[in-house]
Amino acid sequence: MSEEKNTRTVNGRVVSSKMDKTLTVLVERRVKHPLYGKFIRRSTKLHAHDEGNEGREGDWVSIQECRPLSKNKTWRLVKVLERAAS
């Protein structure tokens, strides 16, 4: 049975690319406050595997969930959507 799982894909901003073959990606989402109804921005930092060291700080990237690659890395870089202004 070769069934592919539906893997999550999210977009975010690269906040660090100092590690070898690893990016830190900030993913923001908007949630509604339960009592007041105001939309609040919440964020999550994820470590993503970058095989070719393509991502640079400030880039807008797409990452996809994958099997655990290390203690903290369970995401893989799919593509760079927009380069940061240099």
From Swiss-Prot:
RNA-binding keyword on record: yes
Gene3D superfamilies listed in its UniProt record: Nucleic acid-binding proteins
GO terms (BP aspect): translation
Coiled coil: none
Keywords, comma-separated and alphabetical: Ribonucleoprotein, Ribosomal protein, RNA-binding, rRNA-binding
GO cellular component: cytosolic small ribosomal subunit
Classification via InterPro entries: NA-bd_OB-fold (IPR012340), Ribosomal_uS17 (IPR000266), Ribosomal_uS17_bact/chlr (IPR019984), Ribosomal_uS17_CS (IPR019979)
One example GO MF annotation: rRNA binding
PANTHER family (alphabetical): 40S RIBOSOMAL PROTEIN S11 FAMILY MEMBER, SMALL RIBOSOMAL SUBUNIT PROTEIN US17M
Protein family according to the UniProt entry: Belongs to the universal ribosomal protein uS17 family.
Protein task: One of the primary rRNA binding proteins, it binds specifically to the 5'-end of 16S ribosomal RNA.
Subunit and partners: Part of the 30S ribosomal subunit.
The name this protein goes by in its record: Small ribosomal subunit protein uS17
Source species: Halorhodospira halophila (strain DSM 244 / SL1) (Ectothiorhodospira halophila (strain DSM 244 / SL1))
Gene from which the chain derives: rpsQ
